[in-house]
Amino acid sequence: MPAPQLHLTFGMMVKDQPGIHPALRRACSQEPVYTRLGAIFHDLPYYGNMLAEAVRYGLGSPALDEPWAYRMHSVRPERFVASFIAAAATTPGPLARDERLALVGGLLSHCALDLTLHPLVNYCARRDTEEHGGHESVHHRLTEKYHALFFHLERFGRDPIGTPDFREYSQIVKAGSLVRARVEAPIVQFMRDAYRGAYGDAPDGDTWAGWVRSFRHFGLLVSLPIAKRNSDLKQRDPALRPRYFENDVFRFFDFYACSERRVTELCNLGYDYFDAGDFSTAAADAFVRAARIDDLAEPGLVYPELLAALPPLPRLSVRCTPGITAPPGNEPWRKRDRRRELRQKRRAARVRRLG
């Protein structure tokens, strides 16, 4: 997934997209907190233990597998989006229409960004894994970090990392604090309805509230001056921008242009589905067919024509992640990546147990 600061910024930019229905744009403008919640909703499970994850990140350790995040990104992601919109519209409680629509706009911005930028993130991460070794998830996170850094510098002239503004960005519910894992009751109910509609089960409310609080801890950490110094250091590195953002092979903004088109399409489809108030199986099926939401982690597995519509990227050599970019039958990496395959199988088994 793109970096959290990019997801949050892109979610907040829904209000400025001229092609999106005015009611949805207004909702995202009026309810920035719930827009940000929707924009980061898919990734919240990754923040279950912020201190441990920060240590792992600093040590360059592989990212932890998180079954709930894997489900939302790769196990019927289109059904989860349909369930999320239905829950936003129907969950009882004192939620205003704009609050409900802001959740929808934020979530669809996340989907649009993943579907259009993840192919580029995956390419860069696998390129660097091939060239430098190490675990792909480490290179994946670095790629996301530099994409977000140079995007913010190009678009806004400043990086939000290391600034007090980012503490506010990381507030994604209206209750709770850095200390208390507390979320307003209607949002907890909405969360559980969204998960259950797609998967039949949901995280415990206290667990999910802990993820929300932990995300605020993340916001506090990356708003500190030490994060600003690191950002300034990376901005002065002449090798990073041409490697990750713009070179003879790709331009980040060519992919980002697709993100803006996709978010307009998805937000209008999502608004129509929300506004119609029909959440029957037939209506959900119609929304899913129109939205064409692919695997968010590996776009193109379900709708290869949408992947083909993105700017082209070179095919990596056969020494790459199995089953992703390598031609079928070419398996010189087999022994090297056997452990990776076993990890994937264990992760899939955990997801099945959750189901």
Mark where each language-model region is:
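N-terminal leader/auxiliary helical segments
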Residues: 1-106, 111-355
